[in-house]
């Protein structure tokens, strides 16, 4: 079924006129913009013929410099030149301080706890720095295509959380760009290869960029790109290779590790140059100041082996999550400039048992795929029909239930966009409000998951416990942003929230959440069962105590009351321990000894309801 294209007044396109839309790869090290031209998706070059724009921004007192010239000034003006700003997107001030010496900037905080970089132009947020990069790409596209853009598809790592995705959208808005969609980088690569080769089957997208690593397992069938599983590391990339070589230089040259920002930047530039030279050479001369030495590819491979191994571990986990075997994967697509490193390609080939695909420039493939999707979303028809993309969420979403348990509403690796609803009820008689605690993670207890947001549903009509019906709906849009609503179905009272955390996960937390869920799976199940038994026991105790207070003296003799009190006391004591089986059995015993009491209360209620009524009135009830 075709979608109606609705435009704002004055923006409707002329018949047969293409709407100008682009795909943007906003990368850690480099950025690109691409568009469909004459039926082919291709990157757009600047006036000098360069398609790659270094993600470098230098601030002068009266102007902003972006790209190659800014990158070259990184050593001479390190405090005003910002590199790898993508690593700061959606982060808090405390997060970036943990990176320490890796970031040679002066950070200042604000009321929002967002990190600001102190420059000659004043404090600059990561969103503002990213916006300056996006402005240059927008201007390049409009100059090349000869018109104003209707929008852009901007790619983000699959592991970007809500805060990082929202920060990317904010940067685009600041740059004057209408975001048609945020697209996961691995999915964009699949679009590029799927269109060109009409591939069907299982494909692994190995994306190693400057600052992030993503692995995705996709099923390609008849134009449908379905992401079966994602994984990766939000703090692994070519920058880490540079730091490994820089560490080798410091050790080999007997340098002090406490370098000033300019020296640190020069050191990293020397390391990066050596890394790039070793792509085509077996050895390279590394020079830093008066010191010189030969770095062989073999020695470089040894330096980066732990990082390569980390990436392959994430690959194996993603394959396992997707429910397939390594041998089922028929193609491996390489994305990101860091996949040019020979050892990376060798290791991937060894792990998957086949040579990876590198037919499309790994630096350009993401932007090329994004441009294809942008053209479709802009309403331009393409030969071959529509293209359907099915992204997934990387971490489960849910909410807190009684006992501090995490109830998953949308499991990880669920295709997005998605909406899921689940019904809950009240725990206590007369409960008029419910606290909704939204969580993210894979563990069973809320203490082991990440808190995303809290809100309250008020105005629930007074009822006995369990009578109210509250429907909680989770909606994740195509950009991975979450909104949660809660509605009491009887009265219609409703409350909702859009989850936009003030800052994202710290480096390593995303991978750690998945790792911990695997390591503690059995313990978590045992803990969950215990909590559920404790909650059931507490609910029964409260119900029994309420009944005793209301009708105990009237309906029970002294011996019956003593038996029930003893059973309540024993269950209360057992709940303090960790013997789930004993709690379960004692809960059953308490339920059994109170059966007769419950029956008497029911009889009394029925008698009271029928008292004073005639037969016709009773039949009408």
From Swiss-Prot:
Q: Where is the signal peptide?
A: none
Which InterPro entries does its entry note? ATPase_NBD, Heat_shock_70_CS, HscA_NBD, HSP70_C_sf, HSP70_peptide-bd_sf, Hsp_70_fam, ISC_FeS_clus_asmbl_HscA
- Quick one: a GO biological-process term for this protein? iron-sulfur cluster assembly
* Keyword Chaperone recorded: yes
- Protein keywords: ATP-binding, Chaperone, Nucleotide-binding
Recorded GO molecular functions are: ATP binding; ATP hydrolysis activity; ATP-dependent protein folding chaperone; unfolded protein binding
What Pfam families is this protein classified in? HSP70
Instruction: Look up the domain of life of the source.
Output: Bacteria
What does this gene product do? Chaperone involved in the maturation of iron-sulfur cluster-containing proteins. Has a low intrinsic ATPase activity which is markedly stimulated by HscB.
Q: Which family does it belong to?
A: Belongs to the heat shock protein 70 family.
Question: What protein am I looking at?
Answer: Chaperone protein HscA homolog
